[in-house]
Amino acid sequence: ILKDYNSYSNENLLDFYLLTGGVAKYIELFILNNSFDLKSMIDTIIDPNSMFLEEGKNRLIEEFGKEYGTYFSILALISDSKTSKSEIESILERNISGHLARLENDYNIIKSIKPINAKPNSKVQKYEIVDNFLAFWFRFIFKYQSLIEAENFDRLKEIIYRDISTFKGKFLEKLFIELLKEKQTFTKIGSYWERNNQNEIDIVAIDDIDKKVLICEVKLSEKRLNYNDLLLKSQKFVQDYKTYEIEY
Protein backbone atom coordinates (compact mmCIF):
# COMPACT_ATOMS: atom_id res chain seq x y z
CA ILE A 1 0.00 0.00 0.00
CA LEU A 2 2.76 2.45 0.93
CA LYS A 3 4.55 1.71 -2.34
CA ASP A 4 1.31 2.27 -4.27
CA TYR A 5 1.12 5.77 -2.77
CA ASN A 6 4.86 6.53 -3.14
CA SER A 7 5.24 6.68 0.63
CA TYR A 8 7.35 3.61 1.34
CA SER A 9 10.20 3.83 3.83
CA ASN A 10 11.25 1.56 6.68
CA GLU A 11 10.04 4.12 9.20
CA ASN A 12 6.68 4.63 7.49
CA LEU A 13 6.22 0.85 7.29
CA LEU A 14 6.76 0.52 11.05
CA ASP A 15 4.41 3.42 11.82
CA PHE A 16 1.74 2.02 9.51
CA TYR A 17 2.08 -1.40 11.14
CA LEU A 18 2.03 0.17 14.60
CA LEU A 19 -1.20 2.09 14.03
CA THR A 20 -3.17 -0.36 11.88
CA GLY A 21 -1.88 -3.85 12.60
CA GLY A 22 -3.17 -4.64 9.12
CA VAL A 23 -6.82 -3.96 10.08
CA ALA A 24 -8.67 -3.07 6.86
CA LYS A 25 -10.94 -0.43 8.46
CA TYR A 26 -7.99 1.57 9.79
CA ILE A 27 -6.03 1.24 6.56
CA GLU A 28 -9.01 2.54 4.56
CA LEU A 29 -9.38 5.56 6.84
CA PHE A 30 -5.71 6.47 6.51
CA ILE A 31 -5.89 6.07 2.72
CA LEU A 32 -9.00 8.26 2.65
CA ASN A 33 -7.09 10.96 4.55
CA ASN A 34 -3.89 10.46 2.53
CA SER A 35 -2.09 9.63 5.78
CA PHE A 36 1.00 7.48 5.25
CA ASP A 37 3.64 8.84 7.65
CA LEU A 38 3.57 9.26 11.42
CA LYS A 39 2.68 12.96 11.47
CA SER A 40 -0.21 12.68 9.04
CA MET A 41 -1.53 9.53 10.74
CA ILE A 42 -1.41 11.19 14.18
CA ASP A 43 -3.16 14.24 12.70
CA THR A 44 -5.90 11.93 11.41
CA ILE A 45 -6.27 10.16 14.77
CA ILE A 46 -6.06 13.21 17.04
CA ASP A 47 -8.77 15.28 15.41
CA PRO A 48 -12.02 16.55 17.00
CA ASN A 49 -14.07 14.65 14.41
CA SER A 50 -11.97 11.49 14.37
CA MET A 51 -13.67 8.14 14.95
CA PHE A 52 -10.38 6.91 16.38
CA LEU A 53 -10.85 8.89 19.61
CA GLU A 54 -13.83 6.78 20.70
CA GLU A 55 -12.71 3.54 19.05
CA GLY A 56 -11.64 1.76 22.22
CA LYS A 57 -14.86 2.63 24.03
CA ASN A 58 -17.05 1.77 21.06
CA ARG A 59 -15.39 -1.62 20.64
CA LEU A 60 -15.16 -2.68 24.26
CA ILE A 61 -17.51 -1.01 26.76
CA GLU A 62 -20.60 -2.98 25.74
CA GLU A 63 -18.59 -6.19 25.57
CA PHE A 64 -17.07 -5.71 29.03
CA GLY A 65 -20.30 -4.59 30.69
CA LYS A 66 -20.38 -2.96 34.12
CA GLU A 67 -16.79 -3.99 34.92
CA TYR A 68 -15.36 -2.14 31.94
CA GLY A 69 -13.54 0.31 34.23
CA THR A 70 -11.39 -2.44 35.73
CA TYR A 71 -10.69 -3.98 32.34
CA PHE A 72 -9.75 -0.58 30.91
CA SER A 73 -7.37 0.07 33.83
CA ILE A 74 -5.66 -3.28 33.27
CA LEU A 75 -5.29 -2.67 29.53
CA ALA A 76 -3.97 0.85 30.11
CA LEU A 77 -1.27 -0.51 32.42
CA ILE A 78 -0.28 -3.27 29.99
CA SER A 79 0.00 -0.69 27.20
CA ASP A 80 2.27 1.36 29.48
CA SER A 81 4.74 -1.53 29.98
CA LYS A 82 3.28 -2.79 33.27
CA THR A 83 3.04 -6.26 31.80
CA SER A 84 3.23 -8.71 34.70
CA LYS A 85 0.32 -9.78 36.90
CA SER A 86 2.19 -8.75 40.06
CA GLU A 87 2.93 -5.25 38.70
CA ILE A 88 -0.69 -4.66 37.73
CA GLU A 89 -2.07 -6.01 41.01
CA SER A 90 0.29 -3.85 43.07
CA ILE A 91 -0.95 -0.73 41.28
CA LEU A 92 -4.66 -1.60 41.29
CA GLU A 93 -4.44 -3.15 44.78
CA ARG A 94 -6.70 -6.07 43.92
CA ASN A 95 -6.61 -9.59 42.53
CA ILE A 96 -7.02 -9.61 38.74
CA SER A 97 -6.47 -13.30 37.91
CA GLY A 98 -10.03 -13.71 36.63
CA HIS A 99 -9.91 -10.50 34.60
CA LEU A 100 -6.66 -11.51 32.89
CA ALA A 101 -8.04 -14.97 32.11
CA ARG A 102 -11.19 -13.49 30.55
CA LEU A 103 -9.25 -10.86 28.59
CA GLU A 104 -7.12 -13.64 27.12
CA ASN A 105 -9.50 -16.57 26.73
CA ASP A 106 -12.95 -15.00 26.30
CA TYR A 107 -12.24 -11.63 24.69
CA ASN A 108 -8.96 -12.48 22.90
CA ILE A 109 -7.65 -8.97 23.60
CA ILE A 110 -4.44 -9.93 25.39
CA LYS A 111 -2.10 -12.89 25.25
CA SER A 112 0.35 -14.25 27.78
CA ILE A 113 3.96 -14.68 26.76
CA LYS A 114 6.57 -16.83 28.45
CA PRO A 115 10.34 -16.89 27.90
CA ILE A 116 11.16 -18.99 24.87
CA ASN A 117 12.69 -21.84 26.87
CA ALA A 118 10.23 -21.72 29.80
CA LYS A 119 8.88 -24.97 31.15
CA PRO A 120 5.12 -25.55 30.55
CA ASN A 121 4.24 -24.97 34.22
CA SER A 122 6.41 -21.85 34.57
CA LYS A 123 4.68 -18.84 36.13
CA VAL A 124 7.17 -16.40 34.61
CA GLN A 125 5.07 -14.60 32.02
CA LYS A 126 4.03 -11.21 30.67
CA TYR A 127 0.95 -9.95 28.90
CA GLU A 128 0.59 -7.92 25.73
CA ILE A 129 -2.36 -6.41 23.89
CA VAL A 130 -2.92 -8.33 20.66
CA ASP A 131 -4.44 -5.48 18.62
CA ASN A 132 -1.86 -2.85 17.66
CA PHE A 133 -4.27 0.07 17.51
CA LEU A 134 -5.90 -0.80 20.83
CA ALA A 135 -2.44 -0.84 22.42
CA PHE A 136 -1.87 2.68 21.05
CA TRP A 137 -5.38 3.78 22.07
CA PHE A 138 -4.92 2.73 25.69
CA ARG A 139 -1.39 4.13 25.88
CA PHE A 140 -2.14 7.57 24.51
CA ILE A 141 -5.85 8.26 24.07
CA PHE A 142 -7.42 6.60 27.12
CA LYS A 143 -4.52 7.65 29.35
CA TYR A 144 -4.84 11.31 28.33
CA GLN A 145 -8.63 11.46 28.07
CA SER A 146 -8.63 14.70 30.08
CA LEU A 147 -6.70 16.46 27.30
CA ILE A 148 -9.25 15.28 24.74
CA GLU A 149 -12.14 16.46 26.90
CA ALA A 150 -10.40 19.84 27.21
CA GLU A 151 -9.87 19.80 23.41
CA ASN A 152 -6.16 20.29 24.01
CA PHE A 153 -5.21 18.26 20.96
CA ASP A 154 -1.89 20.00 20.33
CA ARG A 155 -0.64 19.09 23.81
CA LEU A 156 -1.68 15.47 23.28
CA LYS A 157 0.22 15.35 19.99
CA GLU A 158 3.31 16.72 21.75
CA ILE A 159 3.09 13.90 24.31
CA ILE A 160 2.67 11.28 21.59
CA TYR A 161 5.70 12.55 19.66
CA ARG A 162 7.70 12.69 22.91
CA ASP A 163 6.91 9.12 23.99
CA ILE A 164 6.27 7.25 20.75
CA SER A 165 9.86 6.04 20.25
CA THR A 166 9.80 3.94 23.43
CA PHE A 167 6.38 2.60 22.47
CA LYS A 168 7.53 1.82 18.92
CA GLY A 169 10.36 -0.38 20.12
CA LYS A 170 8.07 -3.22 21.22
CA PHE A 171 6.25 -3.15 17.89
CA LEU A 172 9.51 -3.29 15.97
CA GLU A 173 10.28 -6.49 17.91
CA LYS A 174 6.80 -7.80 17.12
CA LEU A 175 7.21 -7.00 13.41
CA PHE A 176 10.59 -8.75 13.21
CA ILE A 177 9.20 -11.81 14.99
CA GLU A 178 6.40 -12.00 12.42
CA LEU A 179 8.90 -11.64 9.56
CA LEU A 180 11.09 -14.41 11.02
CA LYS A 181 8.04 -16.68 11.34
CA GLU A 182 7.23 -16.10 7.68
CA LYS A 183 10.67 -17.46 6.74
CA GLN A 184 9.74 -20.81 8.32
CA THR A 185 13.39 -21.63 9.03
CA PHE A 186 13.09 -21.78 12.84
CA THR A 187 11.24 -24.23 15.07
CA LYS A 188 10.74 -21.70 17.90
CA ILE A 189 10.73 -17.90 17.94
CA GLY A 190 10.14 -15.64 20.92
CA SER A 191 11.75 -13.50 23.61
CA TYR A 192 13.83 -14.37 26.63
CA TRP A 193 14.06 -12.98 30.13
CA GLU A 194 14.76 -14.18 33.62
CA ARG A 195 12.89 -13.47 36.84
CA ASN A 196 12.18 -9.79 37.58
CA ASN A 197 12.79 -8.98 33.88
CA GLN A 198 16.52 -9.58 34.24
CA ASN A 199 18.69 -10.28 31.17
CA GLU A 200 15.91 -9.50 28.72
CA ILE A 201 16.63 -10.45 25.09
CA ASP A 202 14.31 -9.05 22.43
CA ILE A 203 14.26 -11.98 19.98
CA VAL A 204 15.56 -15.53 20.15
CA ALA A 205 14.99 -17.87 17.20
CA ILE A 206 15.84 -21.56 17.57
CA ASP A 207 16.29 -24.14 14.82
CA ASP A 208 16.25 -27.55 16.54
CA ILE A 209 16.71 -29.37 13.24
CA ASP A 210 19.99 -27.79 12.12
CA LYS A 211 20.92 -26.88 15.71
CA LYS A 212 21.22 -23.12 15.32
CA VAL A 213 20.22 -20.21 17.55
CA LEU A 214 19.78 -16.58 16.47
CA ILE A 215 19.93 -14.02 19.30
CA CYS A 216 18.80 -10.49 18.41
CA GLU A 217 18.70 -7.08 20.03
CA VAL A 218 16.16 -4.78 18.37
CA LYS A 219 16.69 -1.01 18.50
CA LEU A 220 15.27 1.87 16.49
CA SER A 221 18.75 3.40 16.35
CA GLU A 222 21.87 1.41 15.48
CA LYS A 223 23.84 3.60 17.90
CA ARG A 224 21.98 2.03 20.81
CA LEU A 225 23.02 -1.53 19.95
CA ASN A 226 25.49 -3.02 22.43
CA TYR A 227 26.99 -6.34 21.34
CA ASN A 228 28.90 -6.95 24.58
CA ASP A 229 25.78 -6.32 26.63
CA LEU A 230 23.89 -8.86 24.50
CA LEU A 231 26.63 -11.44 25.10
CA LEU A 232 26.38 -10.90 28.86
CA LYS A 233 22.58 -11.12 28.89
CA SER A 234 22.60 -14.38 26.94
CA GLN A 235 25.21 -16.19 29.08
CA LYS A 236 22.72 -18.24 31.08
CA PHE A 237 20.46 -18.93 28.10
CA VAL A 238 23.19 -20.34 25.84
CA GLN A 239 24.22 -22.87 28.51
CA ASP A 240 21.21 -24.93 27.40
CA TYR A 241 22.39 -24.85 23.76
CA LYS A 242 26.06 -25.82 23.98
CA THR A 243 25.82 -28.06 20.90
CA TYR A 244 24.12 -25.37 18.81
CA GLU A 245 25.70 -22.79 16.53
CA ILE A 246 24.99 -19.39 18.14
CA GLU A 247 24.62 -16.30 15.95
CA TYR A 248 24.19 -12.75 17.28
Predicted segments with their positions:
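Short amphipathic alpha-helical boundary/capping segments
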Residues: 2-3, 56-67, 87-90
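Amphipathic alpha-helical "lid/sensor" segments that cap RecA-like P-loop NTPase cores
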Residues: 5-61
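P-loop NTPase catalytic cores that bind/hydrolyze ATP
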Residues: 21-25, 82, 106-107, 130
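Short, cationic-aromatic polyanion-contact patches
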Residues: 42-46, 60, 64, 112-141
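Hydrophobic residues on short alpha-helical segments
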Residues: 71-79, 177
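Short acidic, hydrophobic short linear motifs in intrinsically disordered regions
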Residues: 78-91
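Short amphipathic alpha-helical interaction segments
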Residues: 90-108
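A cross-kingdom feature that marks ATP-driven nucleic-acid transaction machinery
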Residues: 123-248
